[in-house]
């Protein structure tokens, strides 16, 4: 059992993906609170907007590690989500600070539904990735 850069990459990806899972869970809970009118949109957007860039940068960093160690399948399964993140951030509403969520439009039914669906899809992708990263870590530790 040897420790190599691929195993290190998968270990870092597991830790980073755990953070991404928590971000996605927080995203889903936050929009469920908005849907049930538990919190007001200004407070909710103020708590969600600072988490957008760290989530995107962490996801891109993990995929740069996969690129550097030559794990092409791991990189390819994440490229669609990275492309969506870039598209979503380019087409964000005009605001004074970084973020995606505008308090004036976040309560519209279609926007709320789209954001909830986005959170659930991200959670599913991150969970599937987490279990694949466990497999990749074990395989890279055993194979060398």
Curated annotation (Swiss-Prot):
Tissue: Expressed in male and female somatic tissues.
InterPro entries, A to Z: Cornichon, Cornichon_conserved
Lineage top rank: taxon: Eukaryota
Regions of this protein lying in the Lumenal compartment: 1-10, 78-122
One GO cellular component, as annotated: COPII-coated ER to Golgi transport vesicle
Annotated transmembrane regions: 11-31, 57-77, 123-143
Family: Belongs to the cornichon family.
Purpose: Acts as a cargo receptor necessary for the transportation of gurken (grk) to a transitional endoplasmic reticulum (tER) site and promotes its incorporation into coat protein complex II (COPII) vesicles. Associated with gurken, produces a signal received by torpedo resulting in a signaling pathway that first establishes posterior follicle cell fates and normal localization of the anterior and posterior determinants, later they act in a signaling event inducing dorsal follicle cell fates and regulating the dorsal-ventral pattern of egg and embryo.
Identification of the protein by name: Protein cornichon
Organism annotation: Drosophila melanogaster (Fruit fly)
